[in-house]
Curated annotation (Swiss-Prot):
GO terms for biological process: 6-sulfoquinovose(1-) catabolic process; D-tagatose 6-phosphate catabolic process; lactose catabolic process via tagatose-6-phosphate. This is Tagatose 1,6-diphosphate aldolase. It is an enzyme of class 4 (lyase). It catalyses: D-tagatofuranose 1,6-bisphosphate = D-glyceraldehyde 3-phosphate + dihydroxyacetone phosphate. SMART domains: DeoC. GO terms for molecular function: 6-deoxy-6-sulfofructose-1-phosphate aldolase activity; tagatose-6-phosphate kinase activity; tagatose-bisphosphate aldolase activity. Signal peptide: none annotated. Belongs to the aldolase LacD family. Its EC number is 4.1.2.40. Keywords: Lactose metabolism, Lyase.
């Protein structure tokens, strides 16, 4: 599937001059509210959430090729971003219905690909929870849903970034060794599926195919994968798609995420960048709540800057241009 010139131009706006997507993710809503609530007794306000997103955008977008925001709380932050920083906007509702089976996808009802584009987005991003081992009844609904969004994005001639998060309803803890054993197949098979032309996905935003905390040499406890087994899972991931793909940071520490990217590269993965969120800015939340705006700004200018600068340095030697795909 060849991309239109407009889509190519839009993805270029989201990338650096080397064709690598070094994007800052701050479309968190439910997760952010929970993080903020850990440091204050009252419910986080809309004003607090919006202001924190603005602070991160003002201080860090000069070092990112693009920023991912949500249209619920992130529009002031989109206006505050650096002029050279591209914009992705999230199209999905945050979280999923824990009382219903299947983690079915849901769009923000007052938004469309057209409206996100009119808001200034260079790409539409949608998050899908997917388990290749779920029932066909569940998965056929998800496939149809993604086909719809893909068609919308084709109609609007705007890139479609699909984020896939894997799960297993029979393994409630996705950080467990039990889930680590099934994760590689789930991640790589989902990538293979959504690379099919019928979905019109332009860029995949994906998990790394292993839990690095269980890789030999990275693990402090139980080892699920030897280094060579882990490396093979990265190679299998690379072979699973012809599309550009970028890694999400999944809330791990900045140091572990950077080490993961080095391991991926050394394994032979031709990934095309990152959408890195909490690994860059999470420490600012506590400072913002407990010490205020100016202290949070100072944190972002020092620790936050170091996190994103170190990440950019790692990307220079590990990621490859999406234009090679």
């Amino acid at each position: 599937m060849t991309k239109s010139q407009q889509k190519v131009s839009s993805i270029e706006k989201l990338s650096n001059q080397e064709g690598i997507i070094s994007a800052l993710a701050f479309d968190q809503r439910g997760a952010l509210k929970r993080m903020m609530a850990e440091h204050q007794s009252e419910t986080p306000t809309v004003e607090q959430i919006e202001q924190l997103k603005v602070l991160v955008s003002e201080e860090l977008t000069q070092y990112a090729s693009s920023i991912l925001l949500d249209p619920e709380y992130g529009l002031p932050a989109s206006d505050a971003r650096n002029n050279d920083c591209g914009l992705l906007l999230a199209y999905e509702k945050t979280g999923y219905d824990v009382n219903a089976k299947g983690r079915l996808p849901d769009c923000l009802v007052e938004w469309s690909a057209k409206r996100l584009k009119e808001q200034g987005a260079n790409a539409v991003k949608f998050l899908l929870y997917y388990d290749v081992d779920d029932t066909e009844e569940i998965n056929i609904q998800k496939k149809a849903y993604i086909e719809r969004i893909g068609s919308e994005c084709v109609a609007e001639d705007i890139p479609f970034f699909l984020e896939v998060l894997t799960y297993d309803d029979n393994i409630p803890d996705n950080k467990s060794a039990e889930f680590a054993k099934v994760k590689p197949r789930k991640v790589n098979e989902a990538m293979k599926l959504f690379s099919e032309d019928c979905f019109n996905v332009d860029v995949l935003k994906v998990e790394v195919p292993v839990n690095m905390n269980f890789v030999e040499g990275f693990s402090e406890g139980e080892v699920v994968y030897t280094k060579e087994e882990a490396a093979q899972h990265f190679r299998d991931q690379d072979a699973a798609t012809h599309l550009p793909y970028i890694y999400l940071s999944a809330g791990v520490s900045a140091e572990l995420f950077q080490d993961t990217l080095k391991f991926a590269h050394d394994s032979g993965a031709q990934f095309n960048g990152v959408l890195c969120g909490r690994a860059t800015w999470s420490g600012a939340v506590k400072v913002y709540i407990e010490e205020g705006e100016q202290a949070a700004r100072e944190w972002l200018r020092t620790v936050g800057f170091k996190n994103i600068d170190d990440l950019n340095t790692v990307l220079k030697t590990t990621a490859t241009s999406w234009k090679n795909k």
